[in-house]
Amino acid sequence: TSLNSQIAKTDQTTAEIYQSGRRVLRTRDTLYQEKQWIFDAQLDKAFSLGETDHQVTYGTTLKQQKVTGSREGGATCVAVGSGCTAIGAPSPMASDSVKKSSDFPDPTINTYSLFAQDQISWDKWTFLPAVRYDYTQLKPKLTQEFLNTVNPTGADPVSDKEKTWHRVTPKFGLTYALTDQYTWFGQYAEGFRTPSAKALYGRFENLNLGYTVEPNPDLKPETSKGIETGIRGKFDEGSFEIAVFYNKYRDFIDEDNAVVGGTVEQFQAINIKRATIKGAEAKGRLNLDAFGAPQGLYTQGSVSYAYGRNDDNGEPLNSVNPLKGVFGLGYDQDNYGGLLSWTLVKKQDRVDSSTFHAPDGDTSGPFKTPGFGVVDLTAFYKVTQDVTINGGLYNLTDKKYWNWDDVRSYDSVGEAAVTGPANLDRLTQPGRNVAINLIWDI
């Protein structure tokens, strides 16, 4: 049993010379805060029944999450001209400033879950039947900051209607020990995902740049049915696992949808009636000390591939990432260790261009993130039993690259309609950088 409370707050300030012709310094302050508490209770019971051994696990999870957000900004003249009468004076153009606003009503999200499973062992077989019940309640709060954004004139309808969803999802897993080293596994599982508060209620518009983000209060929860099978092996020299999966979705939630047609670019989350995601994953580790190398030296690697398809129109799913591989050479001892890793990502070449617009404003087609390779060096040192220092040198070669998730989700805030190369550059990942963490286990 555990009770956890967490507060996460992000406060970001940006400043830029937005339009070179007017020389105005624009500042934007963005705040996002999440408060949540989670209560977990889990019980286990082991017993034998005939020739079978049972390990029953059951419990509940209660979670409450409160989210708040706002943004505001101003502008200062850095040169005289184009309406600016003095250096340091506020910009006279109203569009340069942003009244304190929010793109979504502050939601309170209550989730309650019950789960139970029975791990049944018999001879070389293991059976794992499981069931889960989820209940989600979403209560939006219409703050003045949100109303400043979505309905400053009172012309548009604004809903603060509470949403509730619930569903029972089963799962059944199966393993068979082929030998002492090799195990086959398979699984059937159903999934359930509810829409976000931003997709249901959030609204934002920037008519000067010709785009709006609209809510969709009619979004349905997403459901899925999936199968997975594979084989894993474990030896003194290392381990490996290979798996393939196939998932079918109903009412797949696409939060990056661009509405085609109209005089103003419009973005709105939608349900895709039917969708499919399939793929394969492989990972492995080789203990090099088993072949005469120094004790603790190893190499590891993983490759993941997924293929997504909108079954309504045959187009790709933009939420599916390109082929990715991670390979590393590491050294571990009880109190210290390090890892040199190389991440390789293929160019994103499967994009539904009808629902995606390039953040660089290129009307010839969507921006497809190029492939890249990034090298990272990480290490850890255990100071005491409870205190560990870890850190790393990331992107050692100072590679300029984009993650597809960052580019595709840029659409969801509407800014893909903003032309200008700077918008694309600020979506790049950090160059060469350093991070150090201190972990204290209490």
Predicted regions and their residues:
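C-terminal beta-signal and adjacent terminal beta-strands/loops
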Residues: 192, 250, 297, 346-352, ...
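Gram-negative outer-membrane beta-barrel transporters
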Residues: 43, 121-127, 136, 239, ...
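Solvent-exposed loop segments that connect transmembrane elements
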Residues: 11-29, 72-102, 138-163, 198-217, ...
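Residues on the lipid-exposed face of transmembrane beta-strands in outer-membrane beta-barrel proteins
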Residues: 39-45, 114-120, 172-176, 229-233, ...
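Membrane-embedded beta-barrel scaffold of Gram-negative outer-membrane proteins
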Residues: 1-14, 177, 183-189, 199, ...
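Short loop/turn motifs that connect adjacent beta-strands in outer-membrane beta-barrel proteins
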Residues: 46-55, 124, 181, 237, ...
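Face-selective signature of the C-terminal outer-membrane beta-barrel domain
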Residues: 1-147, 284
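Transmembrane beta-barrel strands of outer-membrane/channel proteins
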Residues: 1-7, 58-64, 129-135, 184-190, ...
